């Protein structure tokens, strides 16, 4: 997940997201992965508390630089038995991709 990369970025010198920025946005990078900024933590807390968890729609372009971390989160959701729908297609993290998948996601949300 992106949160794992952000936690690492805050620890690296000369990173595109220096530790000061990570601290300003997320708090202590050493505690980030165990914090409520991590969707995995939030999901597990909600599940353990017996809360009704939201259904999740995921769409990602196979050429998107975030494809790998999206696959990681997808596998996490599968392992947790989450109620989610996943699809991918040709595209990157651009409006060309989202113009196709946003309406599909909204339609899925309204039906589910």
Task: List each language-model region with its residue ranges.
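Non-catalytic cap/lid and distal C-terminal segments of serine-dependent acyl enzymes
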Residues: 1-112
């Amino acid at each position: 997940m992106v949160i794992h990369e952000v936690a690492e970025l805050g620890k690296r010198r000369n990173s595109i997201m220096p530790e000061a920025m990570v601290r300003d946005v997320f708090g202590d990078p050493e505690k980030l992965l165990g914090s409520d900024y991590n969707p995995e933590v939030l999901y597990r807390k909600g599940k353990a508390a017996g809360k009704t968890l939201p259904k999740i729609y995921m769409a990602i372009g196979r050429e998107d630089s975030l494809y790998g971390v999206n696959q990681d989160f997808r596998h996490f959701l599968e392992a947790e038995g989450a109620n989610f729908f996943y699809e991918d297609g040709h595209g990157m993290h651009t409006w060309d991709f989202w113009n196709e998948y946003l309406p599909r996601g909204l339609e899925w949300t309204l039906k589910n």
